[in-house]
Amino acid sequence: MEQVVTELHAQGFETFLCGMARGCDTLFAESVLAVQRRCPELRLVAMIPCPSQPDAWPEADRARYSRLLAACSEIRVLEPSYSDGCMLRRNRAMADAAALLVTVYDGGPGGTAATIRYARQKGKQILPLWY
């Protein structure tokens, strides 16, 4: 993913939004921070659905999340507490704010599929890393 971030930076992208979920979001955030060491103008913006997002995660994942949050240029908390649909609303807020969506998607149903559909409806550019 570092190569993707490097290529996007070469195209003029400097601000990267991240939902901070486990898995690909975490890898993407780490990639932005790695490239930021060479290109300090890069900004990582955490888009968190609610403060309790990591509460049920294993301790190692919570620690990794905390380290990543501490390194973010900005943290946007979208809702004060968990509620049904807050993850979807976070995803839509990211799609609304983004010029380009970098996606990792296996073709199955769920939040990623819904966000890709939403972004397409909004005319957003999508860069799929895996379909």
What function would you assign to each model-found segment?
Residues M1-Y131:
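Acidic/glycine-enriched connector segments
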